[in-house]
Amino acid sequence: AERNVVLQKAQNDRATAMQAIEELNASSAQVSAMLKERQAARAAAAAAAAAAAQTSAGQGQGASDNWVQGTGQLGWPVSGEITSPYGYRVHPIWGTTIYHSGIDIGVDEGTPVHAADGGVVVWSGWMGGYGYAVVIDHGNGLSTLYGHNSELAVDEGQSVAKGQVISYAGST
């Protein structure tokens, strides 16, 4: 009987873990789709601006969409130990291989989180498996996601500078 209880608990734990993985994968797909849409809009605006510039023979300014180009040199958002590295990893209990598309850095709750580079905030809010999250588009197809925050310090559409406080660490 005790064995059945332990087995049932293990099965429930596995189901919970698999649900969390599915939620993170869905959130990741949501971020990817949002960034692709933003890149397509940026390309269309750039093409329209180039066409307008040709017809006006260089008079006036091209279109802008609150773009901030990052440097491409990412800084660390927080100072701490990497608790979960990028890439494939084996779940410590179930032995299943899962892909981790980022890194987790262990810090105390409330630690200020800094933008790794300049850019535009394209998401600031609750994002499923990432909890309270911020996504920054740095341009040239580069973006960063900062998840599991206790508090957010920036709004969607806001331009941010490298090193600017964007959130505070949590465990959401």
Report residues per predicted region.
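Alpha-helical oligomerization segments with coiled-coil/rod-like character
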Residues: 1-67
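Catalytic cores of peptidoglycan-degrading enzymes
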Residues: 68-172
